[in-house]
């Protein structure tokens, strides 16, 4: 990299975009500082000097949000940033996906991309700035990279598409779409939406791509000015004679028939056996001290299996489990499996199975999101777990990884739109999807299982949601789109395109590809084929349960809503929260109070709610002129008695208003603790209440 600072500027969605190179992080292979509005992101790219053994590309993308970027001090005892939160992890995955396909095939050097948010402007997306920064850091480095790429956020506000919508625009947008690609094609899509049609989604994707092409052209100008010298990478060539011999052996031993074993586990066993048998043919030729030849044979075998799977799909239109390209695996579904859970749904598609379990909580059980933006309260959560046994393996049990966080978030996006608001359903909702068996598309099975669990729990959802994953196999002059891909098709195909939605439209999509990009024609066809598959799955699910149950589980908490005047909130809370804590301690309820005076009372027992409501009504109750109360004498003075009309509200009963007869001393007729009927005669401007017993006698 050049050591001299260079600055390049352009305009992006009405705001200034600046790329600075040559001043910071000069020991990295590539480093850029991206300024977008008041957002500042440092992006660096570093590659190891030597390649790693193995047949995978060791790329790591990190995205770090420094709290000082938003003028905040981290919470917790240590007061410093910890491990990345879920949102940062999702952003790292978002950047990884469009970049990964653009490294040379066979490249095995460790590559680490670090994105550090140094300043955060809520209206200038740090995520999109980091994506451009990652692309630029790679492009101006000596690391082989077939970019640049760019990404944009697309909203849909008042019937118009918007690039990088502001915070206010996002609140009313029907679409939250992130799309990335290079100048020729789109290679990453992620979106949440409120029943967007396939046509609207397609237009949004390519509306975003038009802006991407402009940003890529800007980056190409920067690269042309910097003129980086790329390290030469020469992929390892296969020994053609060895490839030919191994291929002949696979044909003799029936590779096609082995691939077309319909059961996943049996197919895997048969393939392992076939590979082992062929490898033994070369054992005598291998140096006892060197296993490189055997490793090469296995690598060739893996390539040949991939080639055969793709050939069968592209040429013979038959898939490893015998299905046609647009055929869905057998479906099974069930609800109400767990008697003590508030809702449960089991969804099985072929050899993929997800159990989704729903829990209802009070509004106060929300998750607090404290990131670079304002604090947010999340009252709908979807979590996804993928245990080792789901694929017949053993291994350590760890905290959720990037994949589990990503799949959980995708399901959350797909279902968020159908969750009713608090005025209709005053609960916090958490769904956990346990993948019990997996052969591809487990994230979409979790969406289907979650919809079943929502209806089983009696949540009044706006509409059921189903999800499906689409695949792709490309040839030089043709392509085949696959409906409901299984594990082998995901691993050996060119695309994993997940689409979830209702009968009316899309609520979430996610597209990952292993090729350079997709044309408009392919995306349009995949969306339509996904729509047909989604509707077929929906029809099956509705045969199991066609609408939400009328009543909640007997074990679910009960929540009731009451309203008080906003100025009465302080009375319910009390000094330092004393009064509200007394109510909670006495009744055992959970209380959530909104600024408009709405109070949500939650408890497992109706009597607890009723008691809490009575206490709050007493606290917030107001005396009315002309109203008669049976009051209790609390204090006696020379000039009269103070009587309690109801909890928290006293009135003055003047000595002249006690009786029609003249009274010399209040104590002659009243004692502390006595009950007496009084009528409210006046409430002055300070809220002081005057009462009369004499007025009742006069009315007789």
UniProtKB/Swiss-Prot annotation:
One Pfam match: RNase_PH
Stored HAMAP family: PNPase (MF_01595)
Keywords of the record: Cytoplasm, Magnesium, Metal-binding, Nucleotidyltransferase, RNA-binding, Transferase
Molecular function terms from GO: 3'-5'-RNA exonuclease activity; magnesium ion binding; polyribonucleotide nucleotidyltransferase activity; RNA binding
Subcellular location: Cytoplasm
EC number: 2.7.7.8
Cross-referenced InterPro entries: ExoRNase_PH_dom1, ExoRNase_PH_dom2, ExoRNase_PH_dom2_sf, KH_dom, KH_dom_type_1, KH_dom_type_1_sf, NA-bd_OB-fold, PNPase
Primary localization: cytoplasm
Family: Belongs to the polyribonucleotide nucleotidyltransferase family.
Single GO BP term: RNA processing
Record-level GO cellular component terms: cytosol
Keyword Ribonucleoprotein: no
Domain of life: Bacteria
Protein's UniProt name: Polyribonucleotide nucleotidyltransferase
Top-level EC class: transferase
Residue ranges of every copy of the KH domain listed in the record: 557-616
Catalytic activity, reaction form: RNA(n+1) + phosphate = RNA(n) + a ribonucleoside 5'-diphosphate
Known function: Involved in mRNA degradation. Catalyzes the phosphorolysis of single-stranded polyribonucleotides processively in the 3'- to 5'-direction.
UniProt: Mg(2+) binding residues: 490, 496
Swiss-Prot/TrEMBL cofactor(s): Mg(2+)
Domain S1 motif residues, every copy: 626-694
């Amino acid at each position: 990299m050049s050591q001299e600072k260079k600055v390049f500027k352009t305009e992006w969605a009405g705001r200034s975009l600046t790329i600075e190179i040559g001043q910071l992080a000069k020991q990295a292979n590539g480093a850029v500082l991206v300024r977008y509005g008041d957002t500042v992101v440092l992006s660096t790219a570093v590659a190891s000097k030597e390649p790693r053994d193995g047949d995978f590309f060791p790329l790591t993308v990190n995205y770090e949000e420094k709290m000082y970027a938003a003028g905040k001090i981290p919470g917790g005892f240590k007061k410093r940033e910890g491990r990345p939160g879920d949102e940062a992890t999702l952003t790292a995955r978002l950047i990884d996906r469009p970049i990964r396909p653009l490294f040379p095939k066979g490249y095995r050097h460790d590559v680490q991309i670090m994105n550090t948010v140094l300043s955060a402007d809520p209206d200038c997306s740090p995520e999109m700035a980091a994506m451009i920064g990652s692309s630029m850091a790679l492009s101006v480095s000596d690391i082989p990279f077939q970019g640049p790429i760019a990404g944009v956020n697309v909203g849909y506000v008042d019937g118009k598409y918007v690039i990088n919508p502001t915070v206010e625009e996002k609140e009313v947008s029907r679409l939250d779409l992130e799309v990335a690609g290079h100048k020729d094609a789109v290679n990453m899509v992620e979106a949440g939406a409120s029943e967007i049609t396939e046509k609207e989604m397609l237009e949004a994707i390519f509306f975003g791509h038009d802006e991407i092409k402009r940003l890529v052209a800007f980056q190409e100008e920067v690269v042309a000015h910097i003129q980086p010298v790329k390290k030469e990478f020469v992929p390892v060539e296969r020994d053609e004679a060895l490839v030919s011999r191994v291929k002949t052996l696979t044909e003799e031993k029936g590779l096609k028939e082995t691939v077309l074993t319909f059961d996943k586990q049996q197919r895997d066993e048969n393939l392992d056996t076939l590979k082992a048998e062929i490898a033994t043919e070369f054992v005598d030729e291998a140096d006892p001290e060197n296993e490189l030849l055997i490793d090469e044979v296995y690598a060739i075998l893996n390539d040949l299996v991939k080639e055969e799977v793709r050939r069968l799909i592209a040429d013979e239109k038959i898939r490893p489990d015998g299905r046609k390209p647009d055929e869905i695996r057998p479906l099974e579904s069930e609800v109400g499996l767990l008697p003590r859970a508030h809702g449960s749904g089991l969804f099985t598609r072929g050899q993929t199975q997800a159990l989704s379990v729903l829990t209802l909580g009070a509004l106060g059980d929300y998750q607090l999101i404290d990131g670079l933006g304002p604090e947010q309260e999340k009252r709908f959560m979807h979590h996804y777990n993928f245990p080792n046994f789901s694929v017949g393996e053993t291994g350590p049990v760890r905290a959720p990884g990037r994949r589990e966080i990503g799949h959980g978030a995708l399901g959350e996006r797909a279902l968020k739109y159908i969750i009713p608001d608090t005025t209709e359903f005053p609960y916090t909702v958490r769904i956990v999807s346990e993948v019990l068996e997996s052969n591809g598309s487990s994230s979409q099975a979790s969406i289907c299982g979650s919809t079943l669990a929502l209806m089983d729990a009696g949540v009044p959802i706006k509409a059921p949601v189903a999800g499906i994953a689409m695949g792709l196999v490309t040839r030089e002059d043709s392509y085949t789109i696959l409906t409901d891909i299984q594990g082998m098709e995901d691993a050996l195909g060119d695309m994993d395109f997940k689409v979830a939605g209702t009968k009316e439209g899309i609520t979430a999509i996610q597209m990952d590809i292993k090729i350079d990009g997709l044309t408009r024609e392919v995306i349009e066809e995949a969306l339509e084929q996904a729509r047909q598959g989604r509707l077929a799955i929906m029809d099956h699910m509705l045969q199991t349960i066609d609408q939400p149950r009328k009543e909640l589980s007997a074990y679910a908490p009960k929540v009731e809503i009451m309203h008080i005047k906003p100025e009465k909130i302080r009375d319910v809370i009390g000094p330092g929260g004393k009064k509200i804590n007394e109510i909670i301690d006495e009744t055992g309820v959970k209380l959530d109070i909104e600024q408009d005076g709405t109070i949500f009372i939650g408890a497992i027992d109706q009597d607890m709610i009723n008691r809490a409501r009575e206490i709050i009504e007493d606290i917030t109750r107001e005396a009315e002129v002309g109203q008669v109360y049976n009051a209790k004498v609390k204090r006696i003075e020379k000039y009269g008695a103070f009587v309690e009309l109801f909890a928290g509200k006293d009135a003055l009963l003047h000595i002249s208003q006690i009786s029609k007869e003249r009274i010399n001393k209040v104590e002659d007729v009243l004692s502390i603790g006595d009950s007496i009927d009084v009528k409210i005669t006046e409430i002055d401007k300070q809220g002081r209440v005057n009462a009369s017993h004499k007025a009742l006698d006069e009315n007789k």
